[in-house]
C-alpha cells in the first residue's frame, strides 16, 4: 500500500458553479463484487469488476502499452479494437503480432473522418461492450456526443479523466451517472493538481470504473476505504 499525497491546490472562480450536490452525484461510489486488476501493476493497469462476457473491447490511447488489452482479451475470449492516432509507430509495433487486437490509427472524439472516430459504428452494433480510455482530454467530446442508448450498450467502462475542472465537464460525468454506477475511483499520482470546491478536494486526474446499472444487482454504497490493496501508484516519482 502507498501513501496518498495531497498535491498542489488550484482555485478559480470558474469552478464556483460546481456544487456539492453535483460532486456527490458524480463521485458516489457503489459496491461491486469481484474487483480485479487487469494489466500492469502501475500505469496501464485498471481495476474492473469480473462480471462475465463481452461482445468487444474498445480501447483508446494505447501508446506502447497493451498490457490491459492483452490480459482482457485472453481472460474474456473476446476481440479488441484499439485506437491511437498520436503514437502510431509504437501502437502499430505492439499490436502487429496480436491476433485478438486490431489497431486503428485514429483518435477518438465526437466526429468520424480520416483522423477521428466517434465509435458509433460499434456502439450501435453491440450491446455488451467494454470501453477503456486514456485519451488526454478527448474523453469529454466523445462522451458528450453519445446518446443514452449508446451509453447503455456499454456494459462496463474505465476512463482516465483529465482536469475535470469546470461545470461543463462535471455535467458529462453526471450524464454517465444516469446509466452507470461508479464502482472504483483512483487518483493518478503522476499529476499534482487538485481542485477545491467548497472544501471538497478532487484530484486533477483520476481513473473511474463504471458498471451499467442493469448489471449491478445489489445497489449498496461502497464501504471499503480507498485505495484498495490491488491499487497502485501510476508512477513512483
What are these regions (language model features)?
Residues 68-71, 91-94, 141-146, 169-170, ...:
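A short acidic (Asp/Glu
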Residues 58, 81, 132, 158-160, ...:
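Beta-strand cores of modular interaction/reader domains in eukaryotic scaffold and signaling proteins
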Residues 76, 99, 153, 204-206:
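Residues that flank catalytic or metal-binding motifs in active/ligand-binding sites
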Residues 2-51, 65, 115-128, 163-237:
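Rossmann-like AdoMet/SAM-dependent catalytic core
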Residues 62, 108-173:
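Active-site segment flanking the S-adenosylmethionine/decSAM binding pocket
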Residues 76-78, 154-155, 179-180:
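A short helix->loop->beta-strand "cap" motif at the edges of active sites that frequently abuts
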Residues 32-114:
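SAM cofactor-binding core of SAM-dependent methyltransferases
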Amino acid at each position: 500500500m502507498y501513501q496518498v499525497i495531497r498535491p498542489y491546490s488550484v482555485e478559480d472562480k470558474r469552478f464556483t458553479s460546481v456544487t456539492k450536490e453535483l460532486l456527490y452525484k458524480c463521485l458516489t461510489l457503489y459496491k461491486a463484487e469481484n474487483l480485479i486488476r487487469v494489466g500492469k501493476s502501475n500505469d496501464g493497469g485498471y481495476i474492473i469488476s469480473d462480471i462475465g462476457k463481452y461482445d468487444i473491447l474498445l480501447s483508446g490511447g494505447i501508446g506502447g502499452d497493451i498490457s490491459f488489452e492483452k490480459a482482457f482479451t485472453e481472460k474474456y475470449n473476446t476481440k479488441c479494437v484499439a485506437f491511437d492516432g498520436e503514437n502510431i509507430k509504437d501502437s502499430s509495433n505492439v499490436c502487429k503480432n496480436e491476433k485478438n487486437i486490431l489497431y486503428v490509427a485514429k483518435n477518438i472524439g465526437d466526429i468520424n473522418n480520416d483522423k477521428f472516430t466517434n465509435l458509433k459504428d460499434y456502439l450501435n452494433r453491440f450491446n455488451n461492450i467494454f470501453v477503456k480510455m486514456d485519451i488526454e482530454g478527448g474523453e469529454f467530446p466523445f462522451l458528450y456526443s453519445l446518446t443514452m442508448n449508446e451509453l447503455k450498450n456499454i456494459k462496463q467502462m474505465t476512463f482516465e479523466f483529465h482536469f475535470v475542472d469546470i461545470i461543463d465537464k462535471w455535467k458529462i460525468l453526471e450524464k454517465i451517472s444516469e446509466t452507470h454506477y461508479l464502482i472504483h475511483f483512483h487518483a493518478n499520482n503522476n499529476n499534482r493538481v487538485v481542485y477545491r470546491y467548497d472544501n471538497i478536494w478532487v484530484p486533477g486526474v483520476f481513473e473511474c470504473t463504471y458498471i451499467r446499472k442493469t448489471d449491478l444487482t445489489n445497489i449498496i454504497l461502497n464501504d471499503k476505504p480507498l485505495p484498495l490493496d490491488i491499487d497502485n501508484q501510476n508512477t513512483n516519482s
